[in-house]
Amino acid sequence: VVPGYPANKPEQPVIRVSYNDAMEYCKILSQKTGLNITLPTEAQWEWACRGGSDEDFWFGNLNADFGKKDNLADVTTNKFAVSGVDPQPMSPESPWYKYYTFLPKAANVDDGSLVQVGGKKYEANPFGLYCMHGNVAEWTRSDYVPYPYKENPKKVSEYKVVRGGSYIERPKYSTAYSRKGFY
């Protein structure tokens, strides 16, 4: 019996890491390598994500088919409608199906992934980076303050900017410019 969906396989991205833990990991890597390693700023992250594009995604606009490009909410999320102990997709004929397929999604796309995956399942952007849109959200070291903000704002936020969206978010929340605040 599988106790749930896989989330910690070696090829999957690290999840459920606090901002402080991510920064501590960067500090350890810096000490081991002699390089100055840190999380990117919000601007650095967006530049890397775009891969030279000025569109919503590195591969096109909001209506672009992301199926081979990135892991976002799509028809595969219907498989979250499960029954039994071993999570098996619920049949669409089940009277309960409509109550378990409520997640907003891009109904015309199937990227083939239910949860977060190793990046190389999808195409890399022109800079060679995988899954910058969707899959898992990524910390930046920027404070979450309203736009436009100054280079060194006086008010510091306890929230940090995360970018990239996740496997369960619709495309409009995973664009190169979408941002959220977490602490």
Where are these regions (language model features)?
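Histidine-anchored, small-residue-rich loop motif
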Residues: 183
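Functional-site microenvironments in short loops/helix caps that host divalent-cation chemistry
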Residues: 2-180
